[in-house]
Amino acid sequence: MSERYSGPLVVEGKLADAERMKQESNYLRGTITDDLNDGLTGGFNGDNFLLIRFHGMYQQDDRDIRAERAEQKLEPRHAMMLRCRLPGGVMTPQQWLAIDKFAGEKTLYGSIRITNRQTFQFHGILKGDLKSAHQLLHEVGLDALATANDVNRNVLCTSNPVESELHQQAYEWAKKISEHLLPRTRAYAEVWLDKEKVATTDEEPILGPTYLPRKFKTTVVIPPQNDVDLHANDLNFVAISDNGQLVGFNVLVGGGLSIAHGDKTTYPRTASELGYIPLAQTLAVAEAVVTTQRDWGNRTNRKNAKTKYTLERVGVDTFKQEVERRAGMTFETVRPYAFTGRGDRIGWVKGIDNKWHLTLFIENGRLLDYPGRPLKTGMAEIAKIHKGDFRLTANQNLIVAGVATRDKAKIEALARQYGLIDDSVTEQRQNSMACVSLPTCPLAMAEAERFLPEFVTQVEGIMHKHGVGDDHIVLRVTGCPNGCGRAMLAEIGLVGKAIGRYNLHIGGNREGTRIPRMYRENITEKEILTEIDQLVARWAGERHSGEGFGDFAIRVGIVKPVLDPAIDFYD
C-alpha cells in the first residue's frame, strides 16, 4: 500500500450526531407521526427534521419572507419539498396528470420541478397535505422512499430514445438496482400510507441499522452520451453493448462534486474504473460496493463521509479487492467506451423502432403557467392524448417518447400552442443549467435558478458579439458548494458564495470528464461577465477547429487542468 493510501479501513472516533439520530430512529420512524399531529407548528422538530429526508422530503421555508415573518413574531413559513423516486426518469401520462393536479391544488408554488437527477419535485407542501401527497404517489405506482439522506438515491439512466431496445434493457437494470438497494424498513408505509404495524423485527441486510455514512448516488450510462454526468456519482454502470444488445457494464466508483467553502479537506472527484462485469453480476457488485462504503465510510465527519473520500483513504485497489471478495467475483479489464457529449437532442428524433421522440427544452426544469406561456397546462394537455411514456432527463428536460407517426403533428401543435417549443432557444441556453437555490433551499448562499435565464441572455450577447453565437459553452450555476447544479463538471461553473457573489470555475470539458479549476473567487455578476467577455474573445479568435471552450482554456494555459483533485484542486 502506498504512503498516500495508508489510512485505516474504518475511521475510529466520536460518531457524528447523525449516527445517533439514525440509531435511535427505530428504522426511520422517529416521532414523525407525532409531529404530523402537532398543529402548533408547520414544521418538524428535533431529529424528525432530518429523518423526513429518508422519506423523500426536506423541510424548507420561503426565505424571501423570512425576515418579514420574524418581525411579525411568526415562525418561518414552513413547507416541504417532496422528491419522487423515479429510476431512469420514466413515467406514464396518467402518472403525470395525477402529479399535475396535486401540484396545482396542494402546493404553494403550483409548479412541477424536473431535477437533474431525473425526477420531479413538489415545492411548498404544507404539513397537513403531506400524507395525501405520499398517498397520491402510491395510488399511481410511485413513491418518495430513499430520495434523500444516507441511502442510495434515485438511480439515473441515460435518456436514449433512439436505441430503443438498448435503452429498455439499461432502464430495466436501473429499476432493478434501485429496488435492490432500497431500505427494507416498513416505516414509510406505516407513516404515510397508514399501513398497519407488523409484529416483526425490521432488518436492513444491505444498508444496515444506521444506513449509509452519507448520501449515495448511482447511474446507468449508455455511451456515447454522458447526460447523467457519471463523474458526479458514487457508483456507475457504463453500458457495453454488442449488436444493439446489452452484454455487461464497466463499473466506476467514487465520483462526487460537493465541497465546503474554506475547507481544503473537501474536493470534487471524478469516478475511478474498477473493471468490466457481465450482466449477471450487476446486483451483487452494486450490493458489494454499497456495503463496503457502509462499513468503511467515515461516520465521524460527514464532510469526509462520501465514497470519494473512502477511496482516497484506502486506495482504489484495496476498495476493488474488497468488492470482489464480497461479490464473489473478479473484475475483467475495462471494455472500450467513449463519451462525445452530455446535452439532450432537442426536438424530434426517430428511434430504430420507428417511433418518434420529442425532447422539450424546459428551462431550469420548472413547469409552471407563466404569462403567455402556460407550460404546465401544456404538458397536461399532451398527457391527455399521448399513448407512449414521458422521460425526465438529467438535463432537466422532458421527452415525449414513443409517438406514432400519425400522432406527431397533434403533439407538436399542442407543444407549440403552449410555448413548450420555442425555435429561438439557442444552443447556449440548452446547455446551461442551475439548481433550485433561493427562495426555497435552506442551504443556498446565492441565486441560481432565478439568476440563470437573464444571465444566459447576457452570455448569449457576448457569444454573438464574438461570432460564436451558434456554438455553446457548458454553463452551470449552483447556489452553494454542495453542488446540486453540477457546476464542478462544467466548462464554466459558478458556485454561490454570498448573495450576488460567486466563485468562477473554468476548464471542464463538454464530455463531463474533467473538473474545472477556480479562476476567480467571490466576484459579482458584472465582474463575471467581464471575465467571460475576455475569455470568449480569446476562444473565438484562437481556438482550433471544433475546440470546446474548456479544452481551449486548458490548452493555452488560462488555467492548469485538475488532474488529481485530492492533490491539486486548490493549487
From Swiss-Prot:
Gene Ontology MF terms: 4 iron, 4 sulfur cluster binding; heme binding; metal ion binding; NADP binding; sulfite reductase (ferredoxin) activity; sulfite reductase (NADPH) activity
Pfam families: NIR_SIR, NIR_SIR_ferr
Cofactor comment text: Binds 1 siroheme per subunit.
Record's catalysed reaction(s): hydrogen sulfide + 3 NADP(+) + 3 H2O = sulfite + 3 NADPH + 4 H(+)
Binding site for siroheme: C484
Cofactor(s) needed for function: siroheme; [4Fe-4S] cluster
Keyword NADP among UniProt keywords: yes
This enzyme's EC code(s): 1.8.1.2
GO terms under cellular component: sulfite reductase complex (NADPH)
The entry's keywords: 4Fe-4S, Amino-acid biosynthesis, Cysteine biosynthesis, Heme, Iron, Iron-sulfur, Metal-binding, NADP, Oxidoreductase
Xref: SUPFAM superfamilies: Nitrite and sulphite reductase 4Fe-4S domain-like, Nitrite/Sulfite reductase N-terminal domain-like
Enzyme category, top tier: oxidoreductase
This protein's record includes keyword Nucleotide-binding: no
GO BP annotation list: cysteine biosynthetic process; hydrogen sulfide biosynthetic process; sulfate assimilation
Domain of life: Bacteria
Pathway: Sulfur metabolism; hydrogen sulfide biosynthesis; hydrogen sulfide from sulfite (NADPH route): step 1/1
Family, per entry: Belongs to the nitrite and sulfite reductase 4Fe-4S domain family.
Self-association and partners: Alpha(8)-beta(8). The alpha component is a flavoprotein, the beta component is a hemoprotein.
Stated role: Component of the sulfite reductase complex that catalyzes the 6-electron reduction of sulfite to sulfide. This is one of several activities required for the biosynthesis of L-cysteine from sulfate.
Matches recorded under NCBIfam families: CysI, PRK13504.1
Protein name as it appears in the record: Sulfite reductase [NADPH] hemoprotein beta-component
Species annotation: Dickeya chrysanthemi (strain Ech1591)
Gene for this chain: cysI
